[in-house]
Amino acid sequence: LLDPRVKVLAVSDPFIDLQYMVYMFKYDSVHGRFKGTVEIKDGKLVIDGHPITVFQERDPANIQWGSVGADYVVESSGVFTTVDKASAHLKGGAKKVIISAPSADAPMFVVGVNLDAYDSKYTVISNASCTTNCLAPLAKVINDKFGIVEGLMSTIHATTATQKTVDGPSNKDWRGGRAVNGNIIPSSTGAAKAVGKVIPALNGKLTGLAFRVPTNDVSVVDLVVRLEKEATYDEIKLAVKEAADGPLKGIIEYTDDLVVSTDFIGSTASSIFDAGAGIQLNKNFAKLIS
């Protein structure tokens, strides 16, 4: 909505009505109250005077995207993450579908990493996960400059909607059923392995895990790498700074301020390298924070 290059024409949510949409957009526990106008007019959601058609279909095949002229659909339900399931949007007139999550079979692309491999013949693609979008650009910079022999990643991840406020049943992930408040919860993540899909040279060289923590927003990637070429930590910082100011500008950002997590709320960068938080054991072994 804030990007003049993108025109939001419609949304689909089968679980809430228009009045509730207005309320949820106007008031946000993380980002605060929306400073513009939000209203209902002629059966549409109107934000800052911009009308948005609202569909309420559970089956994406029934959403008439073509009727409003929508070419691109962002599939962000977390449910329809395979090519077959996400392709249902095409039946309603959409031309392309971007899955905002990892996919078992859709081609995966991370901005700043492998978009050059995109082919216009693709109708359904995956934009990977938030963690992969943070990790992959950093891994690319380090691998291109120094080479990565192997690495381990931890993501200290903010609370997500699937977690529980109090202990409850979670048959697939027992720890995931524990109360989010007051707990640090170890969890699995495929983000590090997914980097191997977008950077083939790193396939099999990275793996990782997640810790869910009781914060509302902002997560951090902790990447420990063994380097092929010796490098001081200052040389590593310089490589990231040059990428942030050059080819990956707007994708990677660089800070040497003494920041904490809430300082990043609202950031549009995929990955913000915290130069002051990283450490190094020797010239081939370092921990990087982004």
Swiss-Prot record:
D-glyceraldehyde 3-phosphate binds at residues 129-131, 160, 189-190, 212. The active site is at residue 130. The keyword Transferase does not apply. GO terms for molecular function: glyceraldehyde-3-phosphate dehydrogenase (NAD+) (phosphorylating) activity; NAD binding. GO terms for cellular component: cytosol. The record marks 157 as: Activates thiol group during catalysis. The keyword NAD applies. Pfam families: Gp_dh_C (PF02800), Gp_dh_N (PF00044). Keywords: Cytoplasm, Glycolysis, NAD, Oxidoreductase. NAD(+) binds at residues 13, 58. Pathway: Carbohydrate degradation; glycolysis; pyruvate from D-glyceraldehyde 3-phosphate: step 1/5. Its EC number is 1.2.1.12. It is an enzyme of class 1 (oxidoreductase). Its main location: cytoplasm. GO terms for biological process: glycolytic process. It catalyses: D-glyceraldehyde 3-phosphate + phosphate + NAD(+) = (2R)-3-phospho-glyceroyl phosphate + NADH + H(+). PROSITE patterns: GAPDH (PS00071). InterPro entries: GlycerAld/Erythrose_P_DH, GlycerAld_3-P_DH_AS, GlycerAld_3-P_DH_cat, GlycerAld_3-P_DH_NAD(P)-bd, NAD(P)-bd_dom_sf. It is found in: Cytoplasm. It comes from the Eukaryota. Homotetramer. Belongs to the glyceraldehyde-3-phosphate dehydrogenase family. This is Glyceraldehyde-3-phosphate dehydrogenase. It comes from Lactarius deterrimus (False saffron milkcap).
